[in-house]
Amino acid sequence: ARFFDFSDPLYLRIFGRTLYIAAITTVVSFLIGYPMAFWIASQPEKRRNSLLMMLMLPFWTNFLVRTYAWILILRDQGVINTIWVGHIHNAALWLENTLPWLPLEGFVQVTANPLPLFGTTLAIVIGLVYGWLPDMVLPCYAAIERFDGSLVEAAQDLYANRMQAFIRVIFPLTLPGVIAGSILVFIPSLGAYVTPDLLGGAKSVMIGNVIYSQFMSARDYPFGATISFVLMALMLAGTLFYFRFTVAGQKGEPNHG
């Protein structure tokens, strides 16, 4: 009966939403974390340690405190919307009165209302990226630091420009770090429930919230265990993919997927 309930389209949509949010979180973390790791690795050795310390410093505080900080930033009366509705709206009104020939009426109307940030999927992604970004940066940094810079010089001797050297030499050789960071971000994002509970809304429920409600509110332990098992299987699949990729890379064998 519990597997029949699990086949309900509602839970399938929640699982799909969870995979989507976890994937977006992983991609955004990569787009931010890889350039950050590359920049840190390019700094002098003494400065690298300081930069890594600065990266980790905010994460010495309690996770709930950091999440509540994003509530203060993203809510309708938060920092972003205070600037948006206050300063930017006033600036738009001033420009409209000073330069009436500019088509600013639509922009003035938009800035009159708060941005719908809190209680959305965007808020969840922001919170998750902020929470797991070091897990992307550190593996990428380790892979980039081990990279032999003479290979880039060899590629340039063969008339490769910077972009070609990055695509054909640097990125493939640092890909294990990217894969490791992606797994370290994707797996905890799949099981997240505190961040979507605090930053998300009713339309942004993730599977972690469903598991929590099944155990703590509905007291439906069999169904909660069923969902937990499926989620664990997804996490295990991601972990096995990582190990298969790294072992194939170490043996020098092509990975045929």
Regions found by a protein language model. Name each.
Residues 1, 12, 67-129, 163, ...:
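Membrane-interfacial helix termini and adjacent extracytoplasmic/periplasmic loops
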Residues 3-6, 10, 196-244:
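Interhelical loop and adjacent transmembrane-helix boundary motif
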Residues 9-39, 53-54:
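Transmembrane alpha-helix signature in integral membrane proteins
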Residues 36-73, 152-153, 166-167, 175-176, ...:
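Cytoplasmic-entry segments and transmembrane alpha-helices of multi-pass inner-membrane transporters
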Residues 57, 130, 136-150, 160-191:
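Transmembrane alpha-helices
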Residues 141-152, 156, 223-257:
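C-terminal transmembrane helix and the adjacent membrane-cytosol boundary/short C-terminal tail
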